[in-house]
Amino acid sequence: MAFAGVGQGLGTYDRTEQTSGASLGRVASRAHFTDTHPSDDLPAQTEEHRAREVGHLARQLTRQSVGGTDDSSALFSYQQGSDLDPFSDKFCARRWTKLMFEALQTSGPARKAGLSFRNLDVHGFGSDADYQKTVGNLPLVGIGALRDLISNRKRKVQILNSMDGVLEAGEMLVVLGPPGSGCTTMLKTIAGEMNGIYLDESSSLNYRGITPKQIYGQFRGEAIYTAEVDVHFPNLTVGQTLSFAAEARAPRNPPGGISKKEYAKHMRDVVMSVFGISHTLNTIVGNDFIRGVSGGERKRVTIAEASLAGAPLQCWDNSTRGLDSANAIEFCKNLRLNADYIGISSAVAIYQAPQAAYDCFDKVSVLYEGEQIFFGKTTDAKQFFVDMGFHCPSQQTVPDFLTSLTSASERTPREGFEGKVPTTPQEFAARWKQSDKYQELLAQIAEFENKYPVHGKNYQEFLQSRRAQQSKRLRAKSPYTLSYGGQVELCLRRGFDRLRADPSLTLTQLFGNFIMALIIGSVFYNLPATTSSFYSRGALLFFAILMSAFGSALEILILYAQRGIVEKHSRYAFYHPSAEAVASALTDIPYKVINCIIFSLTLYFMTNLRREPGPYFFFMLISFTLTMVMSMLFRSIASLSRSLAQALAPAALLILGLVMYTGFAVNVANMRGWARWMNWLDPIAYGFESLMINEFHDREYECSAFIPMGPGYEGATGQQHVCSTAGAIAGSSVVNGDDYINLSYEYYHAHKWRNFGILIGFFLFFTAIYMTATEFITAKKSKGEILVFPRGKIPRALLAQSTHSHGSSDDVEGGKFAGGSKMKKQITGADRADAGIIQRQTAIFSWKDVVYDIKIKKEPRRILDHVDGWVKPGTLTALMGVSGAGKTTLLDVLATRVTMGVVTGEMLVDGRQRDVSFQRKTGYVQQQDLHLETSTVREALRFSAVLRQSNTISIKEKYEYVEEVLKLLEMESYADAVVGVPGTGLNVEQRKRLTIGVELVAKPALLLFLDEPTSGLDSQTSWNILLLLRKLTEHGQAILCTIHQPSAMLFEQFDRLLFLARGGKTVYFGEVGKGSHILIDYFEKNGAPKCPEGENPAEWMLAAIGAAPGSHSDVDWHQAWINSPERVEVRRELARIKETQGGKGEAALQNKDHEKSKSEVKAEYAEFASPLWKQFNVVLTRVWQQHWRTPSYIWSKAALCALSALFIGFSFFKSGTSQQGLQNQLFSVFMMFTIFGQLTQQIMPNFTTQRSLYEVRERPSKTYSWKIFILSNIVAEIPWAILMGAVIYFTWYYPIGYYRNAIPTGAVHLRGALMFLYIEMFLIFNATFAIMIVAGIATAETAGNIANLLFSMCLIFCGVLAPPSSLPGFWMFMYRVSPFTYLVDGMLSTAVAETSVVCSDIELLTLNPPSGESCGDYMSTYISNYGGYLVNENATTACEFCSMSSTNSFLAQFNIYYSNKWRDFGLLWAYVVFNIIAAVGIYWLARVPKNTGKEQASEPEGVQEKLVPAQSSEKKRESVSRGSESTAA
């Protein structure tokens, strides 16, 4: 819907009535306009009638405008509660529309858009099927891609074939077809979204004189495409989200003399009123993880946002998904009104279109596997196919009939037409093109093109109208409305709104950095102004500069979180992506300034860095500048990549390179010539140099240790002793700071401000890259629906299709072959299975007076209110109700799946209480199709069968049963297909079938629950699913199924109905009856209006009880049920079931138990069907398979290990045993530890994927134990850790040359083997540590942040940056607790102990002995006490002394001793065991429900079953507390 002035001229609104109580302002009714105007409620009328009516309205409005009968100023200066107040119950949309039309007359005619298309051919490049990538075959993919690149070979895939059509301004087109037929591609092509799809040169499109190139560029935003997914900033309120859209497209000169901001606010209020979301003004939008508005309301926010874009041509792709049919009809009616009075053209794809919605449209296009089989008036379509020879059942709606034609199993030829009707898509298309209707269409297209020549009069008017709305500061061909500065300002305001809405990350980072500053400040507390602090000052500044630099690394994740939203807004022409980039960077500046001040103040003055104003402010300046530079660098990486994985992989290596070549770990003098360029390109290096110069320049430091010193040297004076520090001069008691950094680091004071200038240059360079990349590089193209198979298992039929280049695109639809009729014919060879294989059930499940109470925000709320019912074998029972009635909650309560709150009432199986085995004996098909994406269909079914069927059944029998279920569900054609993700894997229907299959193969002994099995499916697929359920019930399956607004044909498939009103109150429980007559009779006799002939009973019932939008009922239907004789009969039947079945069940049970051994009886009632050892074996195999089939995980792990090890190894290549060489070897171990964080973050997402599946589906169904889940995930990581350890060992140990240190000791092999074991322990510790941290935490991101904090602590206190001798006493416990202490101790002592030191020339200290003494005589006492050696023992002047002779002396400075090697190795095993035990313990504490699920034996009526809050995990607590709102849909 386009709204006046936002896009162009005139908008039409319905009134929203707000109600009290639970609905609180949800649209209860949209009152019809008071004027008599038939088009509001009747089906779409003829074009002639509508043209007359619009002309009449225009003349009437013009007369009113001239005569001034209705003051248009009242539009914006209305009184509260008047008929122009959008928040008022009296809001009159028609009057508002008339006034807005008058007000906008002054700005010229409204823009209108229509289009014609001839020979529309669209293709992509891809295939219909692909093979699954694994660790083993991934290299082959690279070779194949290289071959294709060299040969320029692309596989062209045709999506749309030769389509024709015309859509005049003010007309509405509905596009019908099953998923994969090309509906999405058609809409995207019309709207100009050509990302990954291509238009053939022969295709012709004409947008009323505007070319496709102009629509896609200059007029982007005038034709928009709205996808079915809802992408919004979750923490912004609905009001903020829609205000932004309204302001972004507000015209330059709003009517009524008001400001743009006031105008945008008014438009927002009106559009919210129209879509019934005024009550959500201050509610956050939310998403799948953040609670906000309900799913249906979020969908309406998406629709409202697109409406505010004001495009004259709008394409809506399944935008009614998630809305019930009543709201879907309202949406279509609103589009109809816009089309009639403004001239908006709409093209809408709807999967389950109610008849009333279909009647709103002028034209329909029917697609069948990429072929157009009809395009014309909606009133002509049905007759066209009936004349062709097809039968339309009387109870079938026209849209369902048209969609059914694309399914061979659903379409029915009329008598006498068998064999004469078309059967393939190509035959249908050929028949269409031979028809008279097609010739009429071609004539209409020709007329349209003659009327609107390219760049004719209409184009000029369109251009003028658009230009009048744009800012004067915009170039003529800009698609945007606001100037660039205006866009930045708008995005900046939104940025601060987002910050205020969710400051948690910012505050957490501020607090975390403050804590880190305190810790580091205390470690290096009050450094003395002596030479003993030189190393510590360097280490401190190194750590400080890294904290400033890498504080922005998380910005990669933040940018990817908002990328989809920014790209959507760019398509709507709200703003330049680069404007949002500028605003985003500016929004972060206040945080960065505050963080810099807090961090600098704390660290700088605690550690006694140079306490002078100039140096302090320079320290802050460099820290802040470097923070900004690195922020832009990370943002550039995110913007240059198309997926998060592409961004994170180079970022990890880049961070390592930047740290290595800062100048501390490897100083400039020791950098290899071939790697020196990395230092020149490293921004951190320039910052570090400036901070070192800032600290050391022009300062004299007292010498803390002279050589020689001690007994016998008390009288040494002048040049007879020298300070033991680089830069010292013999005889001087102080060391000049400049001399020290010149000699040790090659840093010079002249570089101080030069480096600042270089940092500014880096900032400008990265900012330019960031803004350019943001503007031009879009996210990864979405792949089409293609099936994926393990290598060697792709069916021949699909291989043949791929070869012939017909199928899907990279972009959207490939499901047309993946599940299409052609494939089914060619691949399916097996006969259909008989549903008789389903285990026939005999138990009756009944419930009585079920009540469920929970607390929300400490307020008690009743979700279910005394609900009664039963499910008998061989019956299909529907559970229906309004949104929020508690349908899903009732299923969860009955299936024992709620984990908090209080449940009361009776739930009996054959009159007896449910036992601990109840959950595994029932099947629960959830609404979300959750499966492990790396498994194949057959493997997913086998996994469920092996673990959930009785352990007494052999594996062979279980596998045979799986094959039967595959046939029954008609899944054998894709039994070997990989589940994958939507788009690359199974399509929606196939996933739903698999979800049902997983529960069926478990042989549920009691019943099957299904939650919304048809949600999001097209009508054809929904029908197939219902037929399948019907087939199951005919063979004894008991089924209870929630369903949302079924069509009349679907509704007839159910035997019984349980209908709930809001608050979980029963409205009806009983039989439906043939033609729904029992149900209809009940409601009619209790006061409902008569059900019209041919009406959908489900929709009639909702309207009759006042549950549909626009409906009202004076009857209290819950009370009517309570007082009804039908309820009395239900209660009588429940008592009978309990009495008769209870006795029978007990007797049958005892007989059955007598026939079985004790162990068999125990197994029958056990919590799990399989023993623990079997669970471990099966689950471990699946986890291992998941790793093997996720090559991105294993190869990125291997790449990180190999490349990091090689990078470190060759940066410290062949490090010698000079003092600097030893320091290099120390830092080579330290730098190897820095990959710990990245390795941890690679492990966590894989674990959370498995955990989500386990906790949502497998744990509630008692598939296997939580202990098995944790242990199998840990064990599966160990082999990969060992393999990666070997990779690191060979690429790191040998290049550095550690093995050469062992040659003098004769223990080369022993020490090499010991180093190998230590590296393995490092990686095993890493794997177990990662799982321990993530075990109890909801998201991998949060766990990653905690792991990084702990890792940083371990790194600081391991004894490298701050040797134990310099640590304050209260931090010594951290030194002893840190596992890295023992790793450093073991690895470094194994690497360099027991070897001689050979000083380099610059490390030699020069002094003169007393006259008459040789150097050897003078220094002998000192050497015997403290070690070291003389180069020239016999000299009498200029003694050259090296302060170390053995590497053991160097190691002793860091408290490292070779004798501890086996102690350290044993302690590391202790840490690993601790991690495993802690992982199990933390998971149990945080995420395992503590209620065991056992129930008391039958007690008198009213017994309470208390379900204590079972989990401390916030996520679980929230999901249960949502029972009343979102899950109770």
UniProtKB/Swiss-Prot annotation:
Effects seen without this gene: Does not affect the susceptibility to azoles. Causes further increase in susceptibility toward fluconazole and itraconazole, when AFR1 and MDR1 are also deleted.
Protein name per Swiss-Prot or TrEMBL: ABC multidrug transporter AFR2
Induction, as annotated: Expression is induced in the presence of fluconazole (FLC).
Binding site for ATP: 881-888
Positions of transmembrane segments: 505-525, 539-559, 589-609, 614-634, 648-668, 757-777, 1193-1213, 1227-1247, 1268-1288, 1314-1334, 1353-1373, 1465-1485
Keywords: ATP-binding, Cell membrane, Glycoprotein, Membrane, Nucleotide-binding, Repeat, Transmembrane, Transmembrane helix, Transport
The organism of origin for this protein: Cryptococcus neoformans var. grubii serotype A (strain H99 / ATCC 208821 / CBS 10515 / FGSC 9487)
Database matches in PANTHER family: ATP-BINDING CASSETTE TRANSPORTER
Family: Belongs to the ABC transporter superfamily. ABCG family. PDR (TC 3.A.1.205) subfamily.
Compartments where found: Cell membrane
Compositionally biased region (Gly residues): 1-10
Keyword Aminoacyl-tRNA synthetase: no
Gene3D superfamilies on file: P-loop containing nucleotide triphosphate hydrolases
Disordered as annotated region, ranges: 1-21, 1493-1529
Gene Ontology CC annotations of this record: plasma membrane
Residue ranges occupied by any ABC transporter domain in the UniProt entry: 144-394, 845-1087
Main location: membrane
